[in-house]
Amino acid sequence: MRLNIHKYLFIGRNKADFFSASRELGVVEFISKKCFITTEQGHRFVECLKVFDHLEAEYSLEALEFVKDESVSVEDIVSEVLTLNKEIKGLLETVKALRKEIVRVKPLGAFSSSEIAELSRKTGISLRFFYRTHKDNEDLEEDSPNVFYLSTAYNFDYYLVLGVVDLPRDRYTEIEAPRSVNELQVDLANLQREIRNRSDRLCDLYAYRREVLRGLCNYDNEQRLHQAKECCEDLFDGKVFAVAGWVIVDRIKELQSLCNRYQIYMERVPVDPDETIPTYLENKGVGMMGEDLVQIYDTPAYSDKDPSTWVFFAFVLFFSMIVNDAGYGLLFLMSSLLFSWKFRRKMKFSKHLSRMLKMTAILGLGCICWGTTTTSFFGMSFSKTSVFREYSMTHVLALKKAEYYLQMRPKAYKELTNEYPSLKAIRDPKAFLLATEIGSAGIESRYVVYDKFIDNILMELALFIGVVHLSLGMLRYLRYRYSGIGWILFMVSAYLYVPIYLGTVSLIHYLFHVPYELGGQIGYYGMFGGIGLAVVLAMIQRSWRGVEEIISVIQVFSDVLSYLRIYALGLAGAMMGATFNQMGARLPMLLGSIVILLGHSVNIILSIMGGVIHGLRLNFIEWYHYSFDGGGRPLRPLRKIVCSEDAEASGIHLDNNSIV
């Protein structure tokens, strides 16, 4: 639900107490033209907590439990953590370079660089290293008495040269080796020891995570309070302050009581033309989960109705239809229950995690329900006469369609019987629906009517849901766009007429018993009437510019057809699941099980991606086009940030105003 926001002016003397009390109440966003940036101190707190999070992921909690020194300040802890982390990163870069150097000089073998330098100083004889490209049929030893073969590695031959030897430059390349591999390995061990010592110290400092987190909360609260005070304008040599702010209307009485307590004058003022009224949404349950989805795309404008609940239920439906498998839904539900049990402690203090797991469970239930109606379970094929399929929604609709065909004998029935003459003699709807085609060698190959009916029903359901979804959006936005009445009439009329134009039978005929010919005629004239009504209503609302509304017919038509993606993605997922099952069945049990497991894993990932992307897209693109302005900004009232550790100790449930 979107709550109304009004602009108020506050005038008074007691600035400090007023802002502190306003922060506790949390219903006012004070208006300022100043731009505030994140300070270096706040950034240091965040970086320190990131280091602690990395330690928590790398080590067990038992390894991070150490005795704390209560005399250490938070600032000293943060400084030491950041210094140690910086040093560790520098040492790791040195280790990386050292490993590369070890690989480079390893073929030269172990030697003492100091002894070589001493030998060169006393005798004047230099020792140098060379390498050349290795060739299988070439002798490794050189004829020169001062050239010694060392080793072959990385497809190169390595040599030691004493003194000055004239080697062919086109074949031999000198390699610099100021230090040997054994000396570098000693340096590497020393560096790793230093890294380990610093890492151990970081683990010791992890015990102060709660203090650092509390320090960040306190610092952030002080910064927010300071920024709110900076919004004020001082009057009468600083004796009086004045500040404007956006206020949640439902909390006006509480704010008025606060102002009376601190002798603050409060008056509603008009909104400036260039100001954008912030949007404040307040939801619970599924509405809050829908709000999380809405915030992914855009913040509703102040003039918009809250679409959270609508978006949530539509997303669950679209996601379930796209995944189109009860088995996958069962996995989603079980995963949600498993993670809910594993993170049950965190869920008490993290509303976001709790809502995400609940949404996963609801999506799993939706997939189970829709997969049951379409008899889809891990891509397995059920017999057309099985009880599981007989009571499914698609089977019931297909049977009603068969009854309509035999009773009314429409044009589509005649085309079907001309293609399969054996169907003419069948009078029982169930036998007609389950009629099979006789292939070569007298083998029944497929159900010619059943398969065709099921595909048509699923495709039409996607279009039907699209018409209903868009119509609901237009009805919600009717006060801002009168032409929506005309376009609703156009879509409903088109749904009546198109089956007649295509010579097929629709849900509205065999399920809602709409007369075939009469419905088509009404739909034909209703389409033109809907377009005309949309243009007339647009002209009433927008004067002569409403004539442009006529070109929206293409947009409306394409938006309805866009819902076919639900059918296409659901069909693709079902076909992939069935294909992996068939592939696995042809292989030995172990190999076939691996193929089926990997295949369904890939299909689940693709189904989730398709369900999330296209399930949200149909809401954010097609539906929002007729029921959403967007471009708003969320209300950010001055509120006190609650540290998760403090909330845990006091039993407070965290919301958006918390740092975990």
Swiss-Prot record:
Keywords: Cell membrane, Hydrogen ion transport, Ion transport, Membrane, Transmembrane, Transmembrane helix, Transport. GO terms for biological process: vacuolar acidification. It comes from the Bacteria. It is found in: Cell membrane. The chain crosses the membrane at residues 312-332, 362-382, 453-473, 485-505, 520-540, 560-580, 593-613. GO terms for molecular function: ATPase binding; proton-transporting ATPase activity, rotational mechanism. It is a multi-pass membrane protein. The keyword Cell membrane applies. Its main location: membrane. Disulfide bonds: none annotated. GO terms for cellular component: plasma membrane; proton-transporting V-type ATPase, V0 domain; vacuolar proton-transporting V-type ATPase complex. InterPro entries: V-ATPase_116kDa_su (IPR002490). Produces ATP from ADP in the presence of a proton gradient across the membrane. NCBIfam families: PRK05771.2-5 (NF004431). Belongs to the V-ATPase 116 kDa subunit family. PANTHER family: V-TYPE PROTON ATPASE SUBUNIT A, VACUOLAR PROTON ATPASES. This is V-type ATP synthase subunit I. It comes from Chlamydia pneumoniae. The lineage of its organism: Bacteria, Pseudomonadati, Chlamydiota, Chlamydiia, Chlamydiales. The gene is atpI.
